[in-house]
Regions:
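A short, conserved alpha-helix within the catalytic core of class I
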Residues: 126-138
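Hydrophobic, aromatic-enriched interface-forming segments
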Residues: 119-122, 128
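Gly/Ala-rich phosphate-binding loop of Rossmann-like dinucleotide-binding domains
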Residues: 53-54
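Local beta-strand N-terminus motif with an aromatic residue
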Residues: 35, 114-115, 123
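Class I SAM-dependent methyltransferase "Motif I" SAM/SAH-binding loop
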Residues: 39-46, 123
């Protein structure tokens, strides 16, 4: 799976990248609360990082492909301070920090303590089922208790596209995050891939 993402970035096949802040985030960012340390797993070079920072949050991202991290800071004309760790390279500029490396090796100590909120548009849907089962428990170790989460998922007929992004059913979200309190904020047709007949969903979850 790791080689897949390195290949996609190297070949410029990044149709999953959104050039503007995600519409679910724009509408429901208030679910995260004010002035939080927000964890953004598998963040790529998402505009969402800048958007969250503009709202007064301190943003902690993690991205496997270091070239994507470099591209994010270069495209926003930010000159980051760079620190090498055992398994990650840390890039920090202002209120945005991104760790280049394996998300599953991220620790609370490395990121300066547990984060206070979570925004996930691209992480859960990027992982195959066997990794999704590991993702939620690991993510909880990086957060304070009862942290608010804004989650964006897609559901479509997996036979029509191999993924990633993978289809994540509503029932699976409820199973992965049980017994956390959760609300389905919105469900709408996936306008980016209408040929799949899929659904975009946004969730507010208290971890």
């Amino acid at each position: 799976m790791d080689s897949f993402w390195f290949d996609r970035w190297r070949e410029g096949q990044i149709g999953f990248h959104e050039g503007t802040p995600n519409s679910h985030l724009s509408q429901y960012a208030g679910e995260l609360g004010p002035g939080k340390r927000v964890l953004v797993p598998l963040c790529g070079k998402a505009e969402d990082l800048v958007f969250l920072a503009s709202l007064g949050h301190t943003v902690i991202g993690c991205e496997l492909v270091e070239d994507a991290v470099k591209a994010f800071f270069a495209e926003h004309q930010l000159t980051p301070a760079i620190t090498s760790h055992a398994h990650h390279v840390q890039y920090t500029a202002g209120s945005i920090t991104v760790f280049a490396g394996d998300y599953f090796e991220l620790t609370p100590g490395l990121i300066g303590g547990p984060c206070e909120a979570l925004y996930d548009r691209a992480a859960l849907v990027a992982l195959p089922p066997e990794l999704r089962a590991r993702y939620a428990p690991h993510t909880r170790t990086l957060l304070v208790a009862h942290a608010p989460m804004l989650l964006v998922t897609f559901e479509y007929d997996q036979a029509l596209m191999k993924g990633p992004p993978f289809s994540v059913r509503e029932a699976e979200v409820r199973e992965i995050y049980a017994p956390s309190a959760m609300r389905l904020l919105e469900e709408r047709p996936d306008a980016r891939r209408p040929e799949l007949g899929g659904l975009d969903r946004s969730w507010a979850i208290t971890l």
